[in-house]
Amino acid sequence: MLNLKKLLSKTLEEIADLKAAPSGIDAVVQQGTSGNSNYRVWNNGTVEVWGVVNANCNEMSSFATGLYRIAKELSFAILGTLGVTTITSEQFSVRTTGGSGYATVWSAYIDASNKAHIQVVGSNANAGTVAIDYYIVGTKS
């Protein structure tokens, strides 16, 4: 049985590697990397793209939304290059290391309007590394 706490601490990239192939899929016909992204194309036309985009910044809460948009555009560009015509699922998450180890992250999430939020407290709380993890599945026609 999977340890839920252990699973929740993994990045989306690691989770993508743990996922079993959907039923009816039995072979990867193409796989590789493009920039920060990894991708797999399955024999039934299913395409997976996952990875992480991160950056150091002085204003984590305001910078996170821009970084999320970059992650989304990069991953969708790869899907387009691979011939994907339909997005069947997309997962994005935001995380941070906090400000030089002196900040506490209260919450980090992406809301329904595609705005990333990071709430931190502590000295130098606004400075640190922001990371956007993503896992997207689409289909080729």
What are these regions (language model features)?
Residues M1-N54:
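Glycine-rich, low-complexity segments
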Residues T46-S141:
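Extracellular attachment/recognition segments
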